[in-house]
């Protein structure tokens, strides 16, 4: 990973100009795909331009908006937001119960200054990993699978999940705020919509995840 824990060559952060700034979940993160076959590496090769990949597995729309807020610099030309319809709204429903993330939605001046706190973030992550390693030998296989699927780290304080009846309106607000933020930064926002296979294979057209 790079200096901030994302899947990039570290020197990408030192480029005078960032042509592509990617946010998303596991598709962008590069889960199960090694460099140079992940999306950002392929884009970097085909375009011969600088690409920053800020995707992380498990991220939802609110975390992705918070990522833009925390890491977007003036030298970024294009922000590419990759949305996966299979579970991103479900992730947003969970994220809407996290006070620390809701602050980004309700307070345009809120920041955790994450770029300046990487040493602190690293320590938190190391402590959590060491703590979980001690527990692993006591976990049954099903518990281990659940742990791996649920485990998400980004140095943020997590609160209990609660359902949000307004998560679809939150999604609209997130997109509007993201557009305004990128315009203010003189960057251009591109929203890439990844459809779910089951929507067409199984005819799940009325699933709420597919009807925003």
Go through each PLM region and give its residues.
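Structural preference for long, well-ordered alpha-helical segments in enzyme cores
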Residues: 23, 67, 175-178
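Serine-dependent acyl-ester chemistry module
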Residues: 84-212
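Membrane/wall-proximal cationic-aromatic binding patches
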Residues: 1-46, 154
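N-terminal secretory targeting modules
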Residues: 1-19, 74-75, 88-93, 97-98, ...
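Short, flexible loop segments at the rims of nucleotide/cofactor-binding pockets, characterized by
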Residues: 1-3, 55-59, 167-168
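A structural signal for isolated positions on well-ordered beta-strands in alpha/beta enzyme cores
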Residues: 21, 52, 80, 190-192
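Conserved SGNH/GDSL esterase-like catalytic core that processes O-acyl groups on lipids
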Residues: 29-107
């Amino acid at each position: 990973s790079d200096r901030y824990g994302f899947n990039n060559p570290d020197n990408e952060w030192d480029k005078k100009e960032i042509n592509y700034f990617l946010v998303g979940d596991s598709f962008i993160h590069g889960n199960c795909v090694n460099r140079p076959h992940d999306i950002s590496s392929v884009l970097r090769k085909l375009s011969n331009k600088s690409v920053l990949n800020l995707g992380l597995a498990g991220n939802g729309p609110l975390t992705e908006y918070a990522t833009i807020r925390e890491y977007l610099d003036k030298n970024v030309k294009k922000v590419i937001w990759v949305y996966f319809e299979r579970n991103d709204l479900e992730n947003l429903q969970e994220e809407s119960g996290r006070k620390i993330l809701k602050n980004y939605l309700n307070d345009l001046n809120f920041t955790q200054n994450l770029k300046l706190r990487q040493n602190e973030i690293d320590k938190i992550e190391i402590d959590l990993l060491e703590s979980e390693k001690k527990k692993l030998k006591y976990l049954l296989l099903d518990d281990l699978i659940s742990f791996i699927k649920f485990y998400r780290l980004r140095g943020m304080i997590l609160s209990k999940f609660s359902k949000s009846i307004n998560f679809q309106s939150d999604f609209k607000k997130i997109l509007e705020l993201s557009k305004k933020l990128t315009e203010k930064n003189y960057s251009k926002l591109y929203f890439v919509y990844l459809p779910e296979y089951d929507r067409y294979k199984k005819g799940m057209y009325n699933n709420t995840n597919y009807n925003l």
